[in-house]
Amino acid sequence: MVFFHQPLPLCQRLYYMDIDLYRYFIGRDDQSVNESVMVKRVDQQLRVTKIMIDAVDLYALPESQKKLRAYMFNYLSMMMAISSVFLTMDGRPEAFEKKTELWQYLKNHDERVYNKCSHSVAGACNLPGTLGHKITLWGYHVAQKIFKFN
């Protein structure tokens, strides 16, 4: 994710090449996309999300790149949602502290992106309190059934 996020604003054209560069066997229990593995490795997810927050000032992109800005914002928002959901799944007080720290990190870095993100699906994954956590997990499981992930 980081390898394309930072240089993307500098790209003029993208080309699709229909070749296998990497083969990935899906279905192993210890796979990184396995839900329980993601919860255990949430620190890696947080590290990548913070790198993406730092990588590009979305509002410094020229008006001619507003579609790129929207795409990059949506991707960052998705990363915030994923991090928030897996930290909520963890359920430990330290995990909730990490979630608060992540959102504060985004706010300190760029308040405009924070405000927009907190009023998106990612913000809905950051609802406070026990009821908010239950709603977040319920929404995750509904999305899981609709989009067939994990």
Regions found by a protein language model. Give the residues of each.
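Secondary-structure edge/capping motif, primarily at the C-terminal ends of alpha-helices
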Residues: 28, 56-63, 86-91
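C-terminal, non-catalytic tails of nucleotide-sugar-dependent glycosyltransferases
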Residues: 44-71, 112-116
